[in-house]
């Protein structure tokens, strides 16, 4: 653990508050006309996902947990959870479905991901920005329907719904942003 002043806390930092780990969602410094400047920190408890909001004086000391980011390869999912392997040491880590959240829909076997590790336990996952998936179903194009929205609904091979341009048909491979599930481009493979 490293003690840092509250004003230096940034999004993505992991803080140790009363023995529990929290990931910082937002951190804003406020300087009111009168009074002491404060840092407003919105955090999510890693153990159970509860969101909390704390105010610290900007000079107050907070404990930042030492978190190591390491590349791992996604192996498989079973009843125990999602299994990842460090390609250098061949050590395996397991993350629960709750820890991964909505990102689990984009995990593919053999995919390289970044895991945030604290004391040997994976606490957060960062997927590649884009993944390539196949369109399983989409609505047919109605000729001359250009006055309305230029995107149509589609279902991806992982079951996620997204919007795609009218020229995309079922069976087409497309690049999808993992952050929000939006269409990026047609795959070039």
From Swiss-Prot:
Record-linked InterPro entries: Elong-fact-P_C, NA-bd_OB-fold, Rib_uL2_dom2, Transl_elong_fac_P/YeiP, Transl_elong_KOW-like, Transl_elong_P/YeiP_cen, Transl_elong_P/YeiP_CS, Transl_elongation_fac_P
Pathway: Protein biosynthesis; polypeptide chain elongation
GO CC annotations on file: cytoplasm
Biological process terms in GO annotation: peptide biosynthetic process
Function: Involved in peptide bond synthesis. Stimulates efficient translation and peptide-bond synthesis on native or reconstituted 70S ribosomes in vitro. Probably functions indirectly by altering the affinity of the ribosome for aminoacyl-tRNA, thus increasing their reactivity as acceptors for peptidyl transferase.
Principal localisation: cytoplasm
Matches recorded under PROSITE patterns: EFP
Top-rank lineage group of the source organism: Bacteria
The entry's keywords: Cytoplasm, Elongation factor, Protein biosynthesis
Subcellular locations according to the entry: Cytoplasm
NCBIfam families: efp, PRK00529.1
Pfam families given in the database record: EFP (PF01132), EFP_N (PF08207), Elong-fact-P_C (PF09285)
GO molecular function: translation elongation factor activity
Name of the protein in its database record: Elongation factor P
Family named by the database record: Belongs to the elongation factor P family.
Gene3D superfamilies reported in the protein's UniProt record: 2.30.30.30, Nucleic acid-binding proteins
Annotated SUPFAM superfamilies: Nucleic acid-binding proteins, Translation proteins SH3-like domain
